[in-house]
From Swiss-Prot:
One of its GO terms (molecular function) is FMN binding. GO terms for biological process: protein modification process. Gene3D superfamilies: 3.40.50.360. Probably involved in ribonucleotide reductase function. Pfam families: Flavodoxin_NdrI. This is Protein NrdI. PANTHER family: PROTEIN NRDI. Belongs to the NrdI family. InterPro entries: Flavoprotein-like_sf, RNR_Ib_NrdI_bac, RNR_NrdI. The lineage of its organism: Bacteria, Bacillati, Mycoplasmatota, Mycoplasmoidales, Mycoplasmoidaceae.
Amino acid sequence: MENKRFFIVYYSSKSNNTHRFMLKLNCKCLRLPIEQKDEPDEILESKIPTVNHPFILLTPTYAGGLGKLKGAVPKPVKKFLNNPVNRNNCKAVIASGNTNFNDTYCIAGDIISQKLQIPFLYKFELLGTNSDVENVIKIGNEFWEKNNF
């Protein structure tokens, strides 16, 4: 299955797990900048793009289980969504996570979905499987077409 429709904005840390998943999707996308250790907020904010058209956000989850939510949504994703234009153009979210963290598995998707009142389309573990890739393409295309973006 091929993605010919939707656009994804994604964040991937230096581990590149999310980036490797994105390469399998072979779709139009934009990667958010990686936060550098001890980087002042002003520097990170200056690197954050503005996206002037609809997109689906794909984000990893950084939470350690046991209900610990602090830092679940990566800082560059928060900064990106603090921009009203980006927030308005974010139409859905997909999240990755680690099932070892039980109750906080992919919680970044839940947090963003609730805060922005947008659909949480899909969740997958770490690098994702071939089935995850096919599912994201199918679900993303259906969502995009249904909403006429």
